[in-house]
Amino acid sequence: MHEKDHLPPERMALLFAVMLVTAAGNTAMQSVMPSIGTHLGIADVWVSLAYSWSALLWMLMAPYWARRSDRRGRKAMMALGMAAFALSFSLCGLTLFAGLHGVFGGTATILIFAAARSLYGMFGSASPPAVQAYVASRTGPEERTQALSLVASSFGLGTVLGPALAPLLIVPGLGLIGPFAAFSVFALLVLVTLRLRLPDDDPRFAGRGEVMAAPFSASSNPRLVEDHPDGSPDELPEAEPQHAGGDRLRWSDPRLRGWLAAGVLGGHAQSILLGVIGFLLLDRLGLRHQPDAAAGSIGLVLMCGAIATLLAQWGLIPMLRLGPRASTLWGMGLCCIGTVPLATGLDLHTITVGFAICSLGFGLFRPGFTSGASLAVGRAEQGQAAGIVAAVNGSAYIVAPAIGVWLYNHSHWLAWIVVEALAIGAVVLCVLLMRTPLRTPSHHA
């Protein structure tokens, strides 16, 4: 390999940090927000809706930033995303700190929080595709897959570190706002280092950035079982106009219909589970009257779930060589099993085991569904299929978490019945609609 055909380790570490900090910060926030909402006296559903607004903006803006990352200015796009994360996290932390100290009422606090959070939804999605494109444009074919896999793994690792660090960052004086302050500082340090140490764009190879979902869990942005089913990324046409050489790929396409339906059902099951788990722990552990004590338990459960997800993606799928249909089927089957201890467990151990089983299932399901949709269409349609899959993944986090929390608040059984029904529905789809063999790499469109 030519000496210039790879990224120096220090630059790779910086790009890794860009992705790691945003993923860890978001999942750390998830660990403390149920407790903060309880302190503020806000209905649980409004806390979930504050996330939903940001998720909607992310889904709408991510394709735009991904297109921008295809051009020069990737360093600027990374800086924009990190600056948005740092500013949004700082404003969210200040708003919640003021609300907890009586400066604002509960309703005003959560509305201002949602507005501050929208900055991340609008601009935060600029970083991931820019990082991907930067790496792809500076690495040769031999190193590219490994480098992109390392970048993608930083998101997953961040979802483990965030919940693990959150309880340790709850310090005197700041309390539950500690994680917001800490990750704002981390983001600023990464941003300054990025501006000073990362060279401006001078790409040696063509490189593209992908639309990525917001990092709500370790399986938000799964790696494909087979990253390039039609060959190496260098064999794909460069800068091909959207929909060139064929009709626009539709959601109703018979080749995609079953995969997308399974993706919608499984994605909504996962988002409901993630939306409810923090409030479930507050109730089952009897911590509504001392919510500060719940942050550690919530962080532990989320961390165990993230580890289980990464075990599936980094260990089980490659070791067992599971195909898309098998990954999807087994993943949703494990979700059906794990929902039972979640719905019935009364102690931290049982709830953690149930959540880990479900997360293991989602770790199998997400890559299976994603690669199944990719392999179902031809080479020239890969970009369109990836966009549709990204939309399916993102749409699950817009209203489903809030609906799940609303159902849970009306009856502690309703949310779990819905999750179980969605998972069973996905299993039925796998059995009935995914019997046709997927195309092989030799069957190019």
Segments (PLM) and residue ranges:
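Cytoplasmic helix-loop-helix junction between adjacent transmembrane helices
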Residues: 116-155
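Helix-to-loop junctions at the C-terminal end of transmembrane segments
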Residues: 61-74, 309-324, 408
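Hydrophobic core of transmembrane alpha-helices in multi-pass small-molecule transporters
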Residues: 20, 101-126, 350-364
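Juxtamembrane intracellular "pre-TM" segments in multi-pass secondary transporters
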Residues: 1-9, 199-261
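Symmetry-related core transmembrane helices of the 12-TM Major Facilitator Superfamily/SLC fold
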Residues: 177-195, 415-432
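Primarily marks hydrophobic transmembrane alpha-helices of the MFS/SLC 12-helix fold
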Residues: 78, 328-329
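Helix-loop boundary and gating motifs at the non-cytosolic
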Residues: 5-55, 258-262, 267-288
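C-terminal ends and interior cores of transmembrane alpha-helices
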Residues: 83-106, 334-346
